[in-house]
Swiss-Prot record:
Gene name linked to the record: SFH1
GO BP, one annotated term: chromatin remodeling
PANTHER family attached to this UniProt entry: SNF5 (PTHR10019)
Protein's name in the database: Chromatin structure-remodeling complex subunit SFH1
Biased composition range(s): Polar residues: 134-145
Keyword 4Fe-4S carried by entry: no
Region span, Disordered: 54-84, 102-148, 415-442
Domain of life, per lineage: Eukaryota
Amino acid sequence: MSLVPQAYLSNFHNRVKNEDVPLFTAAQLSRNKRGKQVNYAEFDTDLLDEFIDKNDEDDLEDDVDDSDGRRRGGDYYDQVDGSDGGAAAAAATAAAAAGLGEDGGIGEGTPGSGDPGAVTGGTPAADTGPDGTNDGTAGTSNPSSELDRIKLNDLPDLESQDDSATPLALLKYPRIRETFVQSRIAISYKDLLGDSIQDPQQVDIESPIMVPIRLNVEFSGHKLADFFMWNLNDHSMTPEQFATILCQDLDFPVLSNPNNSPYTQIISMINEQLQEYETLASLQVPDLHVIINLTANLDSKLYDDTFEWNLNDDSLCPEQFAELVVQDLGLQREFVPAIAHSLHESLLKVKKDWLEGNLNLAHVENKAAFGYTSGIRLDIDTLGASWFPKVEVLSQWEIEKREIEKERNMRRLKRESAKVDDGRSRRRGKRRMDDLETTLRI
């Protein structure tokens, strides 16, 4: 799945907490045919009403190239005279957005008022012929205005748009028009789930206990890979509600009966990981300093760092650490949840090893006398080369190689975990049989 923009992540929070969130979303196949992309664009509700009532998909075509090789756009199409009203105004507006006359002829020159077929408004243009086309003899323009039109065609100047006068003026830009045509209305989450979502301000939330969640869902040729943090003490949303919202945004069917549906897989994965990490996440450990080897990759960038972490120190949480790292290294904002999630996973793994007695503490050598903690350590030989963060840009081959190695390591860890659990159950069963035989002898 393509990387979700940070704006979409923040909008997810806004749509949960607020009601007035107009949004267009679209989930479609990506170029590699293996993922889905989520396109979104905020819109005005009045603009949506005008778009639904007065437009048709046939009128929303791409801008047409004129005979002189220029693409008409920007302020070339001004507002439509609304005196005719009704469908005529809507048709004229759509024609203006496409650069066409009412009969389909291509307008040339500066738009102006005239006979039917000419785009109204602006500098008066020449009279049109009987076929509705404009000969363009009266329209004059200077190079600076033409340059401004080209710039506006490529990058729309949204601040100069008068939405009150022309609510459909933005549809002349191809990207915005494409969003309207290929997208659908995304309703508010409260309208989707009713009043089942509780307001966190009205719920007594204890200190947060964060659990890292990782999703790997396959459905109908699509593969969803996602990771996020889940607060065990925040009961304002259930895994079922989260799965409903996620499937709604990605245009997946919300079905609970099929076992292989994405809705069922998401709920099952979240519940399994919550049950697995619930005890470890809430476990309080003594003052314990451990060395963390942290890696987080996003797109083609790989972040690698080694540092010492105190498990009993709450003055710095992984989220704050990730914020500082991203600011210091100038990374993109999507690295904040990636680094925080990876650090939470590493800390839970250390807690699990410590609880099972398998933790090998790799303490940094302390050269202070009489057991005192030394101050700043100076590495004269390597100058601390292994203790500073590194960011590498990987090639496509290196990314695929890392993914394959990660899958192999995951399978190996699962096999080792299964062997350990099987050995423990066998030893437990053997002890029970020995106790039973001893009891029978007595």
